[in-house]
Amino acid sequence: MKQSHFFAHLSRLKLINRWPLMRNVRTENVSEHSLQVAMVAHALAAIKNRKFGGQVNAERIALLAMYHDASEVLTGDLPTPVKYFNSQIAQEYKAIEKIAQQKLVDMVPDELRDIFAPLIDEHAYSEEEKSVVKQADALCAYLKCLEELSAGNNEFLLAKTRLEKTLASRRSEEMDYFMAVFVPSFHLSLDEISQDSPL
């Protein structure tokens, strides 16, 4: 049997820090970000289905979200101001991401490739799946801003404002529900979120 370096590469996502140009009270790596995006994307899909008549596969969306930044293990996490400095850079970075995604897919053993390729290659996502994952990704970045700001780090103030605009542009009923029901707790301390349910 031929060896594959696929999961050895993915395990290194924990070594790539997000927000590299920002001073962080607590650093966040791509691996933990991906888990949070997967949880939030799953919640958005479940809310969409249960409350607003959606027909999306919540489990598949959670998997897509789990792998949505996998290519960063080869490209690194390019800071947003650099990535979107102009349309040419954004377009070139998309091309680099596509190459990195294909390189990861090529690491998967042949007999498993048809399982993992549609999770890593974002071109295999439906528009609706892509939309939910993008909403979750932006929501998690927004939540990171709230956490940093609540810890007194004003470095994230402009990022929060920028992300509020992004969230407004990606707005959906399920996101509105998530924002109303779950996000307010991110402004509270551990004692405040624990007092209703003591152990």
UniProtKB/Swiss-Prot annotation:
It catalyses: a 2'-deoxyribonucleoside 5'-phosphate + H2O = a 2'-deoxyribonucleoside + phosphate. It comes from the Bacteria. The record marks R18 as: Appears to be important in orienting the phosphate for catalysis. It is an enzyme of class 3 (hydrolase). Its EC number is 3.1.3.89. SUPFAM superfamilies: HD-domain/PDEase-like. A divalent metal cation binds at H33, H68, D69, D137. Substrate binds at R18, W19, H33, D69, D77, L78, P79, T80, D137. Belongs to the 5DNU family. It is found in: Cytoplasm. One of its GO terms (molecular function) is 5'-deoxynucleotidase activity. This is 5'-deoxynucleotidase CKO_00504. GO terms for cellular component: cytoplasm. Its cofactor is a divalent metal cation. Disulfide bonds: none annotated.
